[in-house]
Amino acid sequence: MSKKSIHGLTKGTELEKMASMLAQGEAKGAMMYYALANLAREQGMEDAAAVFTEAANQEANHAGFYAALNGMYPRDFWALVRGLAKAEAAGENSLKKLAERFRAAGLDAAAPDLEIFAAQEGHHGAILQKLLDKYGKNIDTTGKKVYVCGCCGYEYVGDLDNEAENYVCPVCGMPKKAFSLNA
């Protein structure tokens, strides 16, 4: 038995603003708890790090729930997943370069983590692509316009001019003007 959808339940209601604030607050809470986990780990408190990590995972889940309530992401999510797969794959090289920049700036302590994150981003791209393949959701872009976010590599398929002027990249939040037409 499938669960009744919560997608967009608060959209256009008096609860929309509250759900939006909760989504943002929970997302920031996840970030905070992960930062606390890193700090605790650096100080040898693995038990505290585990507690903070568990709290962060739950906060991230809560943020996703509120985002779904407001319909922040499309119900037909496969086009978004395709763009995410591209952005995640592009993120691998971007983070490798960032690790090099950290080393060049004498910030060696952070570089190994950035390299781990780079590999994880590449892995995310690969597993998302496997989902697209499994469910037959790859999009044939032949003859279609493809716009690429200059920040994260997210690909928008279609006519970006049809989107509102306040359109932002669903991955990194960059404005519409950050996209360029992929020739």
Annotate the PLM regions.
Residues M1-A183:
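Non-heme di-metal
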